[in-house]
Every structure is written in structure tokens, then in C-alpha cells.
Amino acid sequence: MKRTKRIIDIGIIALLVVAAIGLLAFSWGGGKPNDLSIPVGSFEFTDQDGGQVGLDDLKGKVWVAHFMFTNCSTVCPTLTANMAKLQSEIKSAGLKADLVSFSVDPEKDTPEALKTYIGKFTDDLSNWHALTGYSFEDIQAFGQLSFKTAIQKDAIGDQVIHGISFYLVDASGTIVTKYDGQDPPYSQIIKHIKALSR
């Protein structure tokens, strides 16, 4: 009886030790985020330089995506400024990750308009792809299918209603987690990018 109890106690202690090690590994950035597992659908859109950027071009890279438009009078300036700060944090950490901004107002957001807009927030567009070159219906369907986010036109104005999340995508093109784009947890995002880059 005592022997059986001792074996059970040892088993419980072993499980607790394993759990503690796992928790520490994740907190140190060793754990890869996996609360989402959504494959991004295939795409090939036009970037701010007039070139084509698609899912195949991003394969093998870690990237962070969000939705925006240049005529946005509400959340987009904050989201884009926060994405620019994330770009700076990524560089400071010595990491590599691409940033992808999908326009939800492609009829107005030409490549030139996107380049001018993003240029207000950063001088470095080398790893930032601001994308357009599709119909509103296309980006609406793409957002819903690939990012599980709703995109719709404002019935009484020229604004577009869209989500405010930043999406972290791994090298295989799978969304692994998302963050509040209005108040990003920069240190956590950096840890996650580091974990995915190993």
C-alpha cells in the first residue's frame, strides 16, 4: 500500500516538473504560439511598388498582417503606426519578419497612394508589403476565408469597417495567433517571432 502511494506521489511530482519546464520554456520564448491554426489562402496582389507579391513569395518567412485603408478616419493611423513600431522592435531584436498590409478599399488605394501613406510612418519599406489590385468583393471574401474577419462598407459613408487584429503567420503560411493591433504586446510578439524563426 505504501509502495503504491509512493509510486503515485513520484508520478505526480514528475508531471508537475514536466509542466513547469514547459511553462518556463514558453515564457523564455522557446514555445511556439499555436492558439490558431488557419492556413492563409493562395493570393497574388500588387504591392506599393507595382510589383506582384503572393503567398509563395512569403513562404519560408515569418510575417505579420493586418487590414487597413488610406482614407480611414478612425483606427488605421493607429494600426499603421503600431505596425511601424513593431517593425522597429523586430530590427532592434535582430530578427527578420515581413509586414503585410491588405487594403480594404482597393478602388481608391492605388500602389502610389499606399506607398505615400505607409511612408508617413516609416522610411523603410524593404520588408513591408502594402497590397491592393483586387476588387472589394475579393478582399472581403479573402478576409473572411483566410483570416476569419469581416469586412464591409459603411452604409452611410465612404469608410470601410474591418478588424483591428495583427495576425502572426509562420513560414508555412499558417496563422498561428493574433494580437490587438490598437495595443500590441510588442515583447510577446517578438518572443513569438523568435520562436517561429528557429
PLM regions and their residue ranges:
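Short loop/turn microsegments at loop-to-beta-strand junctions
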Residues: 40-41, 62-63, 163-165
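Thiol-/selenol-based redox modules, centered on thioredoxin-like
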Residues: 153-198
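Short active-site neighborhood of thiol/selenol oxidoreductases, capturing the structured segment around
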Residues: 55-77, 83
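A short beta-strand-turn-helix
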Residues: 43-62, 87
